[in-house]
Each structure stands twice: as C-alpha cells, then as structure tokens.
Amino acid sequence: MIDWTKMRVFDLHSHWGTEKGYRLRTDAEKAQQPQVWKSAASYVTEQEMAEYFRKHRAKTILDLGFTKSLRIEKVREFHDYALETQRKYRDVIFGNWMNIDPRSGSAGVAEVERCLAANSGFIGFIVSGGSVGVPASDPAFDPFYGFCQEAGIPALILVGFTGTGAGLPGGSGVRLDHCHPRHVDDVAARYPDLKIIAGRPAWPWQDEMIAVLLHKPNVWYELHGWSPRFYTESLKKEISRRLKDRVMFGADYPLFTYERLFADWDAEDYSQEILEKVFYKNAEAFFASIKF
C-alpha cells in the first residue's frame, strides 16, 4: 500500500476547474460528463483549484481545451487569463498547454511565441487532432512544430479514443482516426529534434503506440484521461518494463479526481519505485532539459 500523503505528483495534463476555463462548454457536453468520465460538472474558484492541487502535492500543466475552436483574437483573452493565474499560483500551476487551431497559421504561431515571451512559467503546444479536425501529421501543423523545435519546447500530441463527442450525434464530428499513433510517428520522424509527448492511452491502437515509443527516442508518454484499471494488458506490463523511464502521469482533472486515480493506481500493485517514476521522477527528468 502506497502512502499517497507523501507522494509527489507531476501532472502532465489537466483542465481548469473554474467556470471561465472549464473544458466542457455546452449543456450537451456537460450532460455527457457523468456517462463518459463518471463525474459531475461543477465549478471552483482559481484559489480553490490551486488549493486542491496543493493539497495533493501536485504540480500541474493545464489545458483550456476549447480554445482550439476559437478565433485567435478570442484565444488571446483566455491565454491572458491562464498566464495571469499561472503567475499567481506558480507553486502548483507549472505551466499551460497552448491549444490553437493550426489553420490560424502565422497568427497562431505568433500567439504561442507571445505566451512563451510572457515568462509566466512553462509553455507548450498541444495537438488535439480529433477535436480540431486536423491530424497531427497534417502540414498545417508544420509551422508550429518548427517553432517548438527551434524554441526547445515540447509538443503534446493526443492519441487514442477521446471522450470529446462520445455519445453525441456523429461524435460531434470527431474522427477517431485523427488520433492514431501513426501521426505521432510521422511527426517524430520529420522533426527528430522536437521533444514530443504522446498523450492518453492509445486504445484501440495501444500496441502501435508502444511501438512508436520504442522506436522514436524523441517521443515520451503521458496517460491522462483514463483510469489505469482500463489500460490494456500490454500497456500495464510495459509501464514497469521497457517504458518505465518514459511514462508520465496525467490526471485530466476535474474530469478525474486525484483521489480516484490514486486509489486506482494503488490497486494495480506497482512497486513504489515504478509509481515514483510515473508520478514525478520521469517528468522531472524530462523537464530538466526544457528551457522556459
């Protein structure tokens, strides 16, 4: 049994619990939260959110998520909110993932550069291919990858099944194929100096994702959005074997709580050594080479 009151947590991907930043925006999306994530939508203040992270000894990187569907002028407003909150709670908000429609082109790249220049803490770029309707390997993302590679900041590319649109008519237009790990493989091959993190368990293509991780040394892995109870057997095994130095924790707060995830990880019977690697040591090693 792990003493979770002493475990440090480096959360590679969570969302905002505040009303302004909440990931699910429409009534239809919020109605799906109990079915898809087994939790209920509710809001907290920025201070309450920070106190929750602090209570669980967590450093967190947040993703507004919905900004990828907004015009760049509106995106700036939400980014300013995120950066200001990050500055105020630096001890628990390690950074922010910038989620921008790649079709914004040079204006979108300039926005990532603006956020990086704000010096609020870590800034990275996230690719939500399924939700934005553009797979990670599409040339529309190339200017963003080029900037990230030159600036030395990572790109987080989401893979596998997504809860976004799940259960809604037509999946809200989300094409799951845009989340196939082959898109990560393509980007990693074309940008060998780009630090890439694949995000989420990659079911139903988990073995393909494992193959990419074993083949491409510039690709790491974080596991937000799922309870470890539902990982494939191959992923469960590789976490303590060939991927033991490459896998990092992600929570997907507030859709998942730390309390639930700690209990579920505990039930998988990993050793203290492996859990420490997953929950903070691998992330600390990864970010030791990132300049921000």
Say what each PLM segment does.
Residues 52-61, 87-93, 151, 186-195:
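A structural motif corresponding to the C-terminal end of an alpha-helix
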Residues 59, 69-166:
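Active-site gating/metal-coordination segments in enzymes
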